[in-house]
Structures are given as C-alpha cells and as structure tokens.
Amino acid sequence: MQITVMKGKIHRATVTDADLNYEGSLTVDMDLVDAAGMRVYEKVSVVNVNNGARFETYIIEGKRGSGEICLNGAAARLGMKGDKIIIITYAQVEEQELASDYTPKVVHVDEKNRKR
C-alpha cells in the first residue's frame, strides 16, 4: 500500500513579498529549495503561521542567496510581507519500503531566510 509522507519542509520562512498580478506560484530562494530537497515546479503545501491559511501551489526559482519568499497570484491574498510560513513537499512511497529511520529534510531559517 502506498502512503504519503512529508519529503521536505522549509520551516517558518518569512514572506518577503506578495505579487497579486503575477500568474501564480511561490518564488523561493534556490538555496532553500535545494537544501529541502525540493524542485522547481513541484507542488507544495503552504501554511501561514500568522493567519492559519493553508493552500497548495508550486515552486518557481528565486535568486540564490536572496532569501526571497514571494507569494504570487491568488496566493498573495493569503499572506503578506512579514508573515511566517511553512512550505511542505510530500512523496508517495510503498509503506513496506519506508525505512524505520526515514527522516524528511527539514530546513530551519533565520529572520532573513538564511539556513540555520
């Protein structure tokens, strides 16, 4: 049987911008994307710690080392600059293949979205 498990997480990133007029998605600094084992265009769940909003979108490439976390398109209505968010990816795995020591990649960031 397949189960869905958390694959990666960027924990308590700070939203640096929100662009309602962009076509959609979530712009994320590529250093954070790589550290969390995520990919550009991968589906993500986003949880806004400040207002409780939860939504799904996909990642687009942000400049490396910029700390950029930008809510684009309709997602811009679900958060604002300065909000803390959690970005989560998932994977489908065969339950019997899931190692007992499985650990997802979790990236903790500081107030400027630099990996701690």
Swiss-Prot record:
Its EC number is 4.1.1.11. Its cofactor is pyruvate. It is found in: Cytoplasm. One of its GO terms (molecular function) is aspartate 1-decarboxylase activity. Its main location: cytoplasm. InterPro entries: Asp_de-COase-like_dom_sf (IPR009010), Asp_decarbox (IPR003190). CDD domains: Asp_decarbox. The active site is at residues 25, 58. Substrate binds at residues 57, 73-75. Heterooctamer of four alpha and four beta subunits. This is Aspartate 1-decarboxylase. It comes from Leptospira interrogans serogroup Icterohaemorrhagiae serovar Lai (strain 56601).
